[in-house]
Amino acid sequence: DKICIGHQSTNSTETVDTLTETGVPVTHAKELLHTEHNGKLCATNLGNPLILDTCTIEGLIYGNPSCDMLLGGREWSYIVERPSAVNGTCYPGNVENLEELRILFSSSSSYQRVQMFPDTIWNVTYSGTSKSCSDSFYRNMRWLTQKNGNYPVQDAQYTNTRGKNILFVWGIHHPPTDTAQTNLYTRTDTTTSITTESLDRTFKPLIGPRPLVNGLIGRINYYWSVLKPGQTLRVRSNGNLIAPWFGHVLSGESHGRILKTDLNSGNCVVQCQTEKGGLNSTLPFHNISKYAFGNCPKYIGVKSLKLAIGLRNVPARSSRGLFGAIAGFIEGGWPGLVAGWYGFQHSNDQGVGMAADRDSTQKAVDKITSKVNNIVDKMNKQYEIIDHEFSEIENRLNMINNKVDDQIQDIWAYNAELLVLLENQKTLDEHDANVNNLYNKVKRALGSNAMEDGKGCFELYHKCDDQCMETIRNGTYNRRKYMEESRL
């Protein structure tokens, strides 16, 4: 009678890489890299995105009349700005610290417009318009001009009693000629001051023609600040002021992301959103976009990252494992061994049989499960690559930022790949060791009652029915019971 120790083989085509080998065939492997997305803009755990369509964020904040659909308060988890959006500041001019403004606004999760200065507070004309703004003007600012040939000093105050920060905006008009200046403001030498407990700004117009933009050779320079709870804003001007009218009460925290994309909105909720689409995944890594946000796997820029779960599938003599078990004296796997990774095959007078060794298999499975969790834990240090916005004059800063981001991502990708290579090496060697240990366990139990054949089997010196074979498998074999028969 005969009993053999062996391991499983399958028709799997899975391969993994280790520190010393590439493309090692294995019975089972787990892909750790998520590679698919739904191609849509989805809600996240923080809520729905705010999709601006034809407007930019600054168009919303300053109140471009083409963005009237956004005048009501909104909430968002992230903001989507279309690449083709044209409705920003309609009257030509620059927004000071525009990138900071966009970050500040997008980091909140909601805004509510509140009136800061009623029209009755001004004793000049407050209904200035522009053809470049659809013969209208910004919904959050008033263009103050002379009334009946007079422009007395305007002096107004507003105290924030809302209990939350208020984002407010204003502008300074720079006419193209002295004539335009005096027609609007009666004098050429004007001064505007915008002050709070923490802000002190003074402005004078720079009169002169500029290149034609939107049919205009004048400019408005745009400004913004935040009025904290309890602070008072004081506005004093005798000309050229585009005065604050409505402010935005900013509340909450969002993902703080602005996606510039033409993706369609979907009826979906995802853990993780990117500019390419949303994804849900329980895997530790993804390769969709380095600008992913939400509850995301770690981004690494590789095509595949497979963790060995099972054994070597086609063991070869030349590829010996750490203990030599699988690749050595046990020549090939058993396709019929389906209930476990390791097991026994026997032949006796009752026929042949095969059985998995559930104990050693379960211990190996537990170890593999722990291994996957450990990889997740080791890579669980939070890092996010954010698509920061820089102005055109900050190209060097932008280049440095991108270089640092790329290096961080490269380091994480290297760490992940190295960790998986190490674990794959250990897994395959541990499988070798497990088969070897099972073999030695049987060898110790049988002692002199059997002879090794050098191929992973034992020729028994006594008759061994199925019940006897089961005692060898489960570790209850009584060597003394068969010792006398074995000597014959």
How would you name each of these model-derived features?
Residues G59, N94, V270-C272, G324:
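Generic short alpha-helical hydrophobic face used as a protein-protein interaction/packing hotspot
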Residues T261, C268-P315:
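Function-dense linear segments that define catalytic or interfacial modules
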